[in-house]
């Protein structure tokens, strides 16, 4: 047999083998997707049988977040304060846990846990009343924070805008900052920020979303919590630990008609959000 014919036969065999393997992969993916749909439907049915309506259009896809070990970097705190206040000096009352700065335009304090506050004199940082949301984001960017708006509240002559920090585009539910504006002037920032580095942590594989819903229901029963609807679910992190080193733990933030709950993405433990 000519070599060219042998070559063509070999190529045909390879094509057939690849097509067969591709068919197996597609079949497995179809089975997996069908299993996930059935599991999700079962979880939603279990919720309904317990009197809890699932108001989302569909069950969210399984979480892909991994736990992270985080180390807070405090070396940039003075620069962060000066980005808002201008020149500041560290105060003698500073300790290892709490560092104080003061300048002509206000004062700032930073804690090892990432908690901080900055008080500004009126007129130091101003914005058009119609641009406060954008101005707030710009202000937090000066502190090295990427953030999303959570809420806005008006109190007499003041308006308080609450932002949540994002870590690589993922919400950190336990890191929020309040910005208080008075007559177009930013007068106070306070909250918690992450500034440092994170490395993967060996926390185990995340639970499927269907399993999380079942664990959520079990957690409600164990804690004697009550709700009648699930109105939102979002994957993100919470910070564990209050020292310089801690962990970013993956969770599902579950919004209900009676409040929010965090469900650990690996263990399924449920914690009501204060």
Question: What are the residue ranges of the model-derived segments?
Answer:
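Exposed beta-strand-loop-beta-strand "reactive/processing" segments of non-cytosolic proteins
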Residues: 73-107, 112-113, 143-183, 234-263
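Preferential activation on post-signal-peptide N-terminal prodomains/segments
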Residues: 1-147
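Residue-level detector of functional hotspots within protein domains
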Residues: 5, 54, 163-165, 172, ...
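Acidic-enriched, low-complexity/disordered segments with a strong bias for Aspartate over Glutamate
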Residues: 62, 73, 121, 128-130, ...
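Generic alpha-helical propensity signal that fires on short helical segments
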Residues: 37, 72, 83-88, 179-181, ...
């Amino acid at each position: 047999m000519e070599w060219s014919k042998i070559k063509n036969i070999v190529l045909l065999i390879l094509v057939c083998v690849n097509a067969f393997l591709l068919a197996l992969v597609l079949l497995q993916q179809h089975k997996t997707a069908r299993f996930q749909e059935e599991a999700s439907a079962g979880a939603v049915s279990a919720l309904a049988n317990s009197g809890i309506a699932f108001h989302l259009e569909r069950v969210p896809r399984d979480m892909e977040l991994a736990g992270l070990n985080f180390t807070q970097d405090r070396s940039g705190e003075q620069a962060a304060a000066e980005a808002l206040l201008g020149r500041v000096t560290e105060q003698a009352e500073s300790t290892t846990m709490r560092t104080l700065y003061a300048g002509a335009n206000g004062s700032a304090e930073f804690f090892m846990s990432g908690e901080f506050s900055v008080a500004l004199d009126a007129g130091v940082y101003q914005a058009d009343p119609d641009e406060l949301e954008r101005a707030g984001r710009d202000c937090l960017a000066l502190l090295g924070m990427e953030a999303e708006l959570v809420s806005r509240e008006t109190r007499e002559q003041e308006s308080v805008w609450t932002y949540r920090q994002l870590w690589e585009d993922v919400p950190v539910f336990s890191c929020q900052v309040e910005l208080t504006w008075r007559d177009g002037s930013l007068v106070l920032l306070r909250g918690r920020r992450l500034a440092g580095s994170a490395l993967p942590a060996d926390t185990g594989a995340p639970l499927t979303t269907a399993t999380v819903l079942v664990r959520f229901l079990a957690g409600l029963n164990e804690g004697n919590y009550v709700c009648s609807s699930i109105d939102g679910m979002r994957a993100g992190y919470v910070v564990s630990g209050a020292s310089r080193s801690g962990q970013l733990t993956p969770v599902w933030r579950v919004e209900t008609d009676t409040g929010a709950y965090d469900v650990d993405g690996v263990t399924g433990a449920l914690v009501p959000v204060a």
